[in-house]
């Protein structure tokens, strides 16, 4: 009987099998069992798990040893199903059974197995397989849980709970099935074997007990596992809470590893328990007793031979029947029953525990599902939040993209607006065109009518012709009769016929000569055919045309470095010339004089050029210095056309000084204008139109309007000097030779670049098919000037050893003396004169290689350049240029040259692959400009094949026609030193002028690759001065200031740059100039020294004045010329005092006309002189004159040259109605003075930076009427720079400046326009209103006409003028010598340093159309000659930016009761003989100002003009201003300040409008000055010139310069009252004052320092004061008076020396202050000239100093409303913007006191105090309280309206 294995105790892990935990203990054969051990019950136990293929981590060996023994008859079913063999034994200590019991048990087991068929086992195995698969799935899921996140773990736990529930259900089913099987087995076993019932019952009880025991143990194990699961759930909840609190970034996976470990252990325990239950349930039915004895060879539980430890069931269930003895049976049955009972109990307990575990697992599964749901919700929430974050990022990105798109769309909108504006302007132009077309249609109809009339008339004529033919037939018949009569006289007539034949032959010869000349002249046509004609001489051959004020060819040094370095094509290029001068002819308009000063300076500079190491080292294209030196003369570049064609438009060459985009300008038709690029050349046709525009053409062929103030005329001398040698004479007939000016954009030759980039040459047709050449011959290249060369060399026939050549003669008429033919540079053949242009060259080896054949022409002028006519012949000959080399190399330019393979071809030039303008035929050089220093370049020269002509094989490939060359420009070094340094006497005694020739700089301002910043003047190696202008050419120094120069021997000049200074220039001796400078001055015009911050000297030249009748042959050193003998005689008489003799206006007009006639008479005389004497004569016939900065003396010369000229007597007692009289004596000298004035006016027109004023247009109208420029139109010191326009007058041949560069520099440095007409500078709205008022109040006379019976009075600087509608009269005056000496600077207007450069790199406004001239404005222009500009200390620097307006005045009442202000003068002091001059020269009598809210107005009532000529005005007179009233009339309120009010144009980049009187602020730091301009009204066509920005040179810190002082003697200060002033700012006269003697005569002081002042300020705005024991001048705009009650307090203050800073801070505005001004409360006023307004009422004299305003006026406050936004940092041009208050429109600002002189209130806003501009405020002005109630509002509004600025 098989032995049943015993189940191990629960928890006994040592007895477990390796495939089950815990393992079942086996019953061993021969061992008994302890009583109480129950075998497990089959019923209710879970099925055994199939462990086949499973590996468990835990295993333990069974206790004891296996009893050996063979096993036989194994159970096949057990083997197949993989169940453990029952024969396997596991020893258990303490358990053993006897042999009988084993036999009984084996037998029982055999019976028990009967009926235990295969079917239940298969089902169990199937269930076990499913369980195995589920276990595998659970294991995989468990592994996935380890790897996955916590939510996945919860899902797995939920799934495991479901699996546990399923397993529990399966376990129940298996248990029920096991019970059924047990019952069946018990019936089967008990049926065949009769057993006592007690044994069976005992067995059943034992099994039941065993089962109950097993179940209890299983339940306890499951309970433990439930506790573990609960702990795991708690941990899961904790983890879930952490996850919800911390989020993704938190440490939610902190204990995941422990959790996974615990979960695995729990699952393993559950599986272990389930397996244990299953194994018990499986083995309990298999316990029948084993049969003992030999009949049972194998025992159950015996280990198999090959597999120890495995039990194999024996297949002896059916066969042997074992019969046991009765006692043994009973004993065995009892044991089995007891064991069975135990097993049953154990099974029951395990079942209960399993059910509990199942319930527990279900609960855990539910919790796990809830946790997983929560986790899933959190995951979903997390994903949703992350999605929202992603969406937010996406939205931000889209927002940024939308912003970019919005910006782009905004830009597109702006461009569309601009385009729409352009289209609108085009539409308007099209409307004009349509209107014009309608007019044309009407005209066409009219022409058709006229045509019909003409046709009828033609029929009548034809009828008349028919009648005439009939009459002719009749006459013929009569003729036949007459012939018969004449035959009789035929013999007598034959002699006459022979005579006539001789005359005919002579006429034929003359005609042939004329035809030849005509042919030659066609080759050199006039100005109408410039673009297709040649330059050079006219058709007169060797006979030059007469000269007339033409440019004299400048002497050039052929080998000089300047010629090497100047770029060909640049205006300053000077090419070698022959002795024959360039031939020019007169054109139809007046010509300018020759550049006399330039020619003279060249005569002296040529000496230094030889010795200078580098004269012009950087050949840049558009050098500022060279361009400004270009004399703007009217001499045409080409020969004049015949008389019949003189009326056509002539062509001139202009240079664009600034870039200009018409679409950015204000004009309505920008498409009709040409865009300009700085440095570009433009062809100009005809004269300037009334709008200030030229008709021009660019190099690319585009034509349109060109603003005249953006371009500058290029003089003929410079053009001729830039031409190639064959172009400067009459040698070449090709058309586009002038187009070299367009090369490279700025006059640069091929490869040159302008500032706007490379410009292609204009496509022009040449008669011979030649291409353009942009470069003149470099030094040493090309033949000498004016030597024609042969053209178009060709090979007629080529043999093996000979070649036949032919060429064309030079097209110019030249005395040919033969030809030389060279082969490879060797002379091979010489041809004599008159030989045909052919040659046969023999004995030439043409097969070995190419030979270079060239032809040289031998003429009377010399030999031509053989390379101009050359050709390569022989084997391998081609067109490729050879010997490509660098001819000259600098840091920024390079010249290349080559030997052309065929001179008939043009050559394309490439630089770094970029195409440059080509070199035309017969040119073998090119110049590259604007290169970078130290840069590698590659140049390529390619021969261009003509489109039609013979081609050779291989010519189609460019590489067969090109040669390349690489070069590296020189590195940038120090700039070059200036040339031609000279120390000369200045234009007045005590003034020394140091002049030099500025270095050549390009458009970027660089020389030798570095930027030029200025020049430094050294005296014997010690620096004495710096000039901060790269284009400055001279500087004036006062001898008394430069004591160092009196001890030194020579002066040198160095060029300054950021990288250092250049080497010294050639020194210039000082002693001769010092000796001459100390002599009395002749006709001299002082040139100012610039302000320290600008430091740009103004050029000044002092050429002599000569007479045309004395052509001097030998030039005199520059600046030391004397006058001619005739003038010297006059000059020797000295000035004499003569009473003024009045003259009528008619006499004045007659004098002007006589002068203009004399000028016209002089020009032909000059032109008829020979070419040789013209240059020296013009060089000697010069007059010392201003360089564009000093106001010339109208109608007279000045200084010692002033002879017995007519003068003006000072009008005493206010007698203004007496007309200004003209002396009849010395009219010749006065006419000469007119010439001088006119020339000065023309000089001032050289600058393209000047304003094209409406005033100038009026003068042009007057000029057209009178034929001469009126003396009133002279150039003012304040910067009335008038540029040259088409209608300029005949230039004066006696006055010329050193160079246009100096004129331009001077004009740049001058202050803004000070003396202009009211129309020019008045506010547009105000002007319109005033015009309306005038139109209402004076319906009689118009604005452009005036009754001659009402003479118009005006003050001239040194002279007076009385204007009439038809033109001004001339009023020369003769000042006294002493007066001239004392007031020399007053007369000449020496302005030192207060010139402000307005250029800033861009031009001024374009001109507007003319308007009807106002005679009053003519007088206004005459008022300023002696004004502040004309004095040595004209205007404090505070107001340099302002443009006060001086309007003309007229005496007498006009209809409507509108009184014109008159003028009155009084001079209580000063010597009587000087009264006539002093009264006119005093700034007091020449400055008319508006004193807003001043006592002058209040006292004057209706107002009147009082022009005081007091030599020493009091403080009450605000800088020479007169009390001015305002006209009564309806109040007109300006709608608001202009957008450009106080805008810093140099910062905002907005166009600055010139011409307006800017009421600048003068109270806070002195650097504050408004620099604004006027917006001119549109002309009829609506076109305006482009508005430009003004550029104000910044000052260092907040310092400013003191005004210049006049040399007047101050009265003794001991006799004057003592006053105490406090310094408002630091002042160092050495660095801040423009006066030459500032260091000696002016006092330095610091801010807050107390100064002792004696008396009142002088006419120049300076006090005489004392500081630190030193006495000197103190500028009034730098100090303020301290109110002191007693002399003791004054002395105490002076002992203190300084005021505390807090006192100065409190005194910064109009608030409480310890100091006060003598004129207005608050900060002291600055001497300024404000805008003049028209006055009502008779002329009144200023009663005296105005009374001080009561202190109550300072304390009065009133609220005012801001009308506009104002930000001082954006809208204020002043330097101290922190002193001004920012505010918004609508803010209520409390203002204190009255408005200051600058239009500012002192106000308070939000607790902050500062200055507030009055024209930004609304509400009644505070000045209304002091005016009459009836006019307060009107006057307030009018005051504010007048302060609106642009």
From Swiss-Prot:
Ranges for domain SH3: 649-716, 1616-1684, 1755-1822
Localization per record: Cytoplasm; Mitochondrion
GO cellular component: calyx of Held; glutamatergic synapse; mitochondrion
Keywords on record: Cytoplasm, Mitochondrion, Repeat, SH3 domain
Bias-annotated ranges (Low complexity): 599-612, 1817-1830
Gly residues: bias regions: 742-755
All residue ranges annotated as the Fibronectin type-III domain in the record: 787-878, 880-972, 977-1075
Disulfide cysteine pairs (residue numbers): none
Pfam families in the record: SH3_2, SH3_9
InterPro entries xrefs: FN3_dom, FN3_sf, Ig-like_fold, RIM-BP_SH3_2, RIM-BP_SH3_3, RIMBP1/2/3, SH3-like_dom_sf, SH3_domain
Ranges of biased composition (kind: Basic and acidic residues): 1202-1219, 1411-1420, 1545-1577
Biased composition (Polar residues): 576-587, 1270-1283, 1705-1719
Its job: Required for synaptic transmission regulation. It probably controls the recruitement of voltage-gated calcium channels to the presynaptic membrane, and modulates neurotransmitter release.
Quaternary structure annotation from Swiss-Prot or TrEMBL: Interacts with RIMS1 and RIMS2. Interacts with TSPO. Interacts with CACNA1A.
Name of the protein described by the UniProt record: Peripheral-type benzodiazepine receptor-associated protein 1
Annotated organism of origin: Mus musculus (Mouse)
Name of the encoding gene: Tspoap1
